[in-house]
Every structure is written in structure tokens, then in C-alpha cells.
């Protein structure tokens, strides 16, 4: 049997592995449900600190706008004053995903997303869609029901109350 070397002096060395396990992972994401590797808010909601000359928001301000990792490249391109190429070495490049955060960083909008934008995730067979405050999530058992569940993440960021009976899914997500 091989045990990883978790001595603090060896952190980051080959053979070291640091993790505090699922129960502490859940504690670290309180009040959200679940943690990394899941599509509940605890797995996809993150803190991000941004600083620099393009940030015009008040110091210490908190923004709760919906953002996605796919937004990073469009943001960096816009800050750099350049654009995403349509082709490279004579080959067409697929369109970039994501939206620039620059209008949000400059304090002109609260989110790069509108209420009609849809974000989608798939990870390890689990999947989720979000539009505005509504989130439709399917997660495998034992953490999920292996069925679609609808949540209002603005009113219930911990995803404790399934809203399937309150709002028809086709009225929420087109």
C-alpha cells in the first residue's frame, strides 16, 4: 500500500496529496450544497478577487453576478484591446464562448449575463442549466435524485427547496 507524503515540508512535491475530505469540503462551501466536482452551488460558486487598473468598482465591493470560466478569455482580450481570431494559419477557429467581464469590472453592469442567457455544465455525467435565477440540475445518486430538479438560486442559494411544482420547466428555460 502506498501512502502519500502529507508532511507540510513535502507539500507540492511529487507523491504528496492534500485534501481534507468530503465532510470538510462541504463545511468550506457552507451555506451552499455540496462542493467541488458537483454541480450544486457549492461546486460551481467561487469567490474571485479582481484588482487592477480596469477595475472601477468601489474598493471592497461585492458582486454576485453570474460568471463562468469561459468568460476569462473574452475579458482578457477586451482588456488587451484585441479580438478573438476568426481563423488561424488558414483554418477557421470555432467561435469563443463566454462574455467579457469588462463592463462589470468598470461598474457599468452588475453581471455580464442577462436573464435570457443560459449557462450549461456537465461533469462526470451530472448536468445543470442556469438562466437568470433559475437552475435546473440533474445529479446522480446518492447526492442527487438521478432526476431533474428546479431551484431558484436567488431565493435559495443552498438549493434546499426543489421548485418543480411552482413553475413549469418549459416556462423557465426555453
Regions inferred by a protein language model and the residue ranges of each:
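Metal-dependent active-site segment of extracytoplasmic phospho-/sulfohydrolases and closely related
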Residues: 1-11, 43, 49
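C-terminal cap/loop subdomain of S1 sulfatases and analogous C-terminal strand-loop tails that border
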Residues: 13-44, 55-65, 70-154, 158
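Conserved residues at the C-terminal ends of beta-strands
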Residues: 52
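Short histidine-centered catalytic/ligand-binding loop motif
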Residues: 62-63, 164-167
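Carboxylate-dense, calcium-coordinating segments in secreted/extracellular and ER-lumen proteins
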Residues: 159-163
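Acidic, proline/serine/threonine- and glycine-rich low-complexity intrinsically disordered segments
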Residues: 168-174
Amino acid at each position: 500500500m502506498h501512502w502519500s507524503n502529507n508532511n507540510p515540508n513535502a507539500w507540492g512535491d511529487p507523491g504528496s496529496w492534500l485534501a481534507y475530505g468530503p465532510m470538510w469540503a462541504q463545511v468550506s462551501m457552507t451555506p451552499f450544497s455540496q462542493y467541488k466536482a458537483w454541480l450544486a452551488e457549492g461546486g460551481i460558486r467561487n469567490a474571485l478577487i479582481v484588482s487592477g487598473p480596469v477595475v472601477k468598482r468601489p474598493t471592497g465591493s461585492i458582486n454576485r453576478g453570474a460568471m463562468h470560466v469561459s468568460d476569462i478569455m473574452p475579458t482578457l482580450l477586451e482588456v488587451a484591446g484585441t479580438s478573438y481570431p476568426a481563423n488561424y494559419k488558414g483554418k477557421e477557429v470555432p467561435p469563443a464562448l463566454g462574455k467579457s467581464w469588462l463592463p462589470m469590472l468598470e461598474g457599468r453592469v452588475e453581471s455580464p449575463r442577462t436573464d435570457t442567457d443560459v449557462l450549461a455544465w456537465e461533469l462526470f455525467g451530472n448536468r445543470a442549466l442556469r438562466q437568470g435565477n433559475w437552475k435546473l440540475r440533474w445529479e446522480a445518486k446518492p447526492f442527487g435524485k438521478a432526476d431533474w430538479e428546479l431551484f431558484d438560486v436567488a431565493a435559495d442559494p443552498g438549493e434546499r427547496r426543489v421548485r418543480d411544482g411552482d413553475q413549469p420547466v418549459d416556462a423557465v428555460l426555453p
